[in-house]
Amino acid sequence: MTLNQEQIMNYFTRIGLNYDDYKCHKLDGQLLAKLCFAHNISIPFENLDILNHKMISLDGSILYDKIITKHRGGLCFELNGLSEIFLRSLGFGVKDLSSRFFRDAGDDIPMQRHRLLKVEAVDGTYIWDIGIGQRSPKYPLRLAEGLVQKQCGEVYKLEKEAFYDWVLYEYYKEQWLRILSFTEQ
């Protein structure tokens, strides 16, 4: 699915931005950051459909109707799913990735139960994740090993590990903690 011009404009409105201010902007990390932050403060992570025993659809037109038209939120699969369509419609290169959460996983190998996006911009590759629903990056992270990235009073970095491949860490309470891992496959 690709969003048409009207749908793109509606998406911008839903996240509190004026499409005309961005329609000629180059497809770079600066634009990604503005879009991601606007999305994070405008569209909530929510699981009301699960609590109400309603089926969740990952069909793009259904996601658009739920999140943009009906002003709802969603889970990571929904929010990042619609974001993938939106970013691709703007012209970004986007790849859907599965990931594993480490929070509350204990010593077990966490299941792949989270969706995030790898986005190709003109100035590099970024990780976009607007569907965590708890302490997490508010802006896309540059996909670069060991690069410490500060945002909104929080500190993150990505490291490569043999078993998990890419691992996202946050610096919290004087230590680096794993948040999630993903591969680029």
Stretch-by-stretch model annotation:
Residues T2-H71:
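Secondary-structure boundary elements
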Residues L3-R14, Y19, I43-P44, R100-Q185:
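His-Asp-centered catalytic microenvironments across diverse enzyme cores
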Residues K23-K26, K34, K54, K66, ...:
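Context-gated lysine
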